Amino acid sequence: MGSSTETLALIDEAVQRPRQRTGIPEDLPTPVDEVELDRWCAAYLASDATASQRTPPSVRIPNGPSADVAASWGGQSLVDSALIQIPVLIVRGEWDHVTTDEDARRLFNALRGASDKRDVKISGGNHWLHLQPRRVALWAEVRSFLGER
């Protein structure tokens, strides 16, 4: 499922489940076990009170962020990052297929006005790093960055 209206897309469990493996080398095990993924999928569907009214149950998500990502991948800058003057932490997993090294480098270099900027790539994770065993490293990086403020 992945049908959309002008402003919303409907995303079901069958679409979400395979995403947690995207970018992870084939010879490595899936870092999110089935029990954890089942729990996450249930919480994901519960996040939309209308999910159970559709078959299959699905979550309404705004299309805006997807359009913004597509525009960015197409070379269109959506903001003038040089105007950002606050501390910025860019953090991603080593196998993140959404935020690539090139994307992070481009943003890091564009943040010319940031009072502090840091680019961190965490080993052993992809774009779903927040659900994976290496999420502890993600939390540590965020805590460290925020603790310095």
Model-predicted segments: where are they?
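C-terminal alpha-helix
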Residues: 141-149
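Conserved alpha/beta-hydrolase "acid-adjacent" motif
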Residues: 97-103
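A short, conserved beta-strand element in the Rossmann-like catalytic core
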Residues: 2, 98, 129
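Alpha/beta-hydrolase
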Residues: 2-89
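Catalytic histidine neighborhood in serine/cysteine hydrolases
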Residues: 112-128
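Short, glycine/charged-enriched secondary-structure capping and boundary segments
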Residues: 6, 104-107, 134-136
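Catalytic histidine-centered segment of alpha/beta-hydrolase-like enzymes
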Residues: 125-139
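Catalytic His-Asp charge-relay segment
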Residues: 85-92, 96, 107, 117-120
